[in-house]
Amino acid sequence: MKNARGALLAVLTVLGAAMTLATAANAADAILSGAITSAAGEKLGGVTVSAKPTGGTVTTTVFTDENGDYYFPPLPAGKYRVWAQAVSFATAKTEIELPAARKQGFVLNPMKDFVRQLPGNVMLSALPEETEQDKRMKRMVRNNCTGCHTPSYILQHRFDEAGWNAIIELMKNANVYGTFVGNDRKPAGILDYHQKELAAYLARARGPGEGAMKFKPDPRPSGESARVMFKEYEVPLDPDSGLPSNFVQNDGSDWSLGTPSVLIPGWGIHDAWLDLDGQLWFTCNIPNRRTTIGKIDTKTGELKLFKVAAPNGLAAQTHGMTRDDKGIIWFNVNNGRGGLGRLDPKTEKIDVYLPPQGMSPTGGATTVDHDGKGRIWASAPDGALRFDPVTETFTEFKSLTYKTPNGTGVTYGAAGDRDGNGWWAEMTLDIIGKGDDATGKSQEVKLAAVKEEMNRATPEARSFYETYNQPDFNNPLPWAQGPRRMGTDKKADVLWIGNSWGANLARIDTRTHETTYVPLPGEQQPYHVAVDTKHNAWTNLWGADRVLRYDPKTSTWTAFDLPTRGAEPRYVSLLEQEGAQTQVVLPYFRARKVAVMTLRSESDLQALKTKAGSQ
C-alpha cells in the first residue's frame, strides 16, 4: 500500500552560496605537509591538523605520524586557515595560500588548564571513586546526566553545591530532548531521590576549588588511527532563525573553547549515509520549515534540502535512515502519521508510504534498516514494522513486554538480519524484540543486569527502585544495560547491540539467541553499531568524540578520534566499494556537521610523502 505517491513528492530547496571547493585541474592541487614539535623540541605524533578554505564549509583533517610529520591529500588552490591541536597544548593557528605555501610547521606550547579540551569519556573517568558511595554517584552521573548530552558539556564547568543542585532541579523536570516538562509530569524519580547526595558529590568533584577529579588524557592516535583522513561538512544556520552567519562562535573545531551548546540554530543532523555515488544524505529531526532530509555534495560542499510537507506547515521530521543493497535511501517520516520514505539518489524523487489505520506508525527513537530479503524494518513505538517494497505492504510486530511497573518499553533501535527477521530494542526495559519471519510472531531476548551495580545499591535505594517508574530512556536504574541502536552482520548470523549504560556490545546469535557481552575499553559508552564486510563491528561513542572498531576474530579494539570536540555522533554508517578506500560516516548531532572518515593505508601515506617531496 502506498499513499499520496505524487502528492508527497519532495520539494527541493537549494541553499545559495554554499561553499564550493574549486574543481581545478589536478596539476593546480597541492599537498600541504609539515612537522609539529613541542616548545621543548619534541616531535609530536598524533596531533590533529585541520585545514579549511577561507569562507568555506568543508574542513579536512589529518594526524601527525610518529615523527611528528603530517600529509594532507591534494588540496585545491586558495587561502586556508590551518590549525594544529593536541590535549594539554594551546591551539596553534595560521593562514596560508596554496600552492605557494606547501610546507607549514607548528610549535605547540603547553596549556596549564586544559580541562575544556577533554572529551567526555576522559571527564567521566576522572570522577572520584574512592568509596562505594563515590562509585554509586559516579554511576548516577554516567547514566542519568549524559542521556541528553555528552558529559564534557556539563563537566567543563564548575559549580558549588547550590549550583549543581539547581541544575539537577531543572534536569529532573526535562525530557529526553532537554525540554522542560515540569508542568506536565512528575519529576524524574531517580534524580529526585538522589538529588541532595548527587549535588554534594558533584560539588566535591567539580566545585569552585581544586576539585577531586583526576584527569588522565588518553594517548594520542598512532598507527592506523593516525593515518585516517576526515572531511567535515558543515550545515549552515537555518535562515528562518534570522541570525547572522557568524552567530556560532564555537562549533567544536577549537578544543580550547570547550564543548559547544547543542542550541545551534540550524537543521538537526541525526542519521547520515553516503550513496553509491559518494554523495551524503542526512535526516533532520529538528522542527523547521525547509528540510526533511538533506544532501551534501562531497566534492563542493553544496547543500540541497528536500522537504516533505507536514500538516502544520512545517517540514515533516525524520530520524532514522538506511541505504539498501540497490542504493535506495529509506527513512522514516512524520507527515502527520509516522510513515516510511523512499528516495532514489539518481532521480532525487521521494515517495512516502503510510501504515494502514489500526496499525502502529513508525516511531519511538526511529531506526531504519533492511534485511537479507530486501524488506525494510523501522521502529514503531510498541515494536517494529516491516515494509515490503515489492508489494508495498506493511507487517506489524508487537513487543511481548511493553508496560511494566518500572517503565514502558518504547522502541529505540531496530535492524533486519540476513534471514529476513527483524530486531528492536526496548531500551528502558533491557529487552530485545524479534520479529520472526518464519512464524510471523514476536519473540524477545532479555539482557542480563549489570550485577556489580545491582550489588552496590543500598537497601534503602533498592526499596525505592522497586517502585520507580522510568519516565523515558534516559532515567535508568543503576544496573541497566540500556540497549540503544543495533546492527546485524549481513554475512553472518550475528546481531550487535550498543548497550549505553552497560558499556558493552551485546552479541546475539540470530538463530539460537545465545547472548554474550563484549566490554568496551575504559567503560566507554556505545550508541549505534554498523558491521562491515569483514565482520568488524563499528560503534560511535556519542560522549567520547570517537568511533571504535571491534574485530571479533582477534577480540581487539581500534579507536579513531574525531576532530571536533562535543561532536556527539548518534549514528555510524559505511561505504565499502571494490578498489576504493573504506569510508565511515559520522553525523554530528551537537556540532551540526557530517564527517566522513577515510581509512588510509601505509602505502597511501607513502605515496603522499613521495609526492610532497617532489613538489
What is the meaning of each model-derived region?
Residues 242-244, 263-276, 311-325, 358-373, ...:
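Beta-rich, blade/repeat-based domains predominating
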Residues 141-152, 198:
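The canonical Cys-X-X-Cys-His
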Residues 35-44:
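Structural motif
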Residues 563, 567-615:
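Blade-level signature of beta-propeller repeat domains, shared across WD40, Kelch, NHL, RCC1
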Residues 274-275, 282-287, 329-336, 376-382, ...:
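Conserved beta-strand positions in repeat-built beta-propeller and related beta-rich domains
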Residues 55-57, 79, 83-95:
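A short, solvent-exposed loop/turn motif at the edges and junctions
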Residues 54-69:
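Short, acidic Ser/Thr/Gly-rich low-complexity loop/linker segments typical of extracellular
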Residues 98-121:
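Extracellular beta-sheet/turn segments enriched in Thr/Pro/Gly and aliphatic residues
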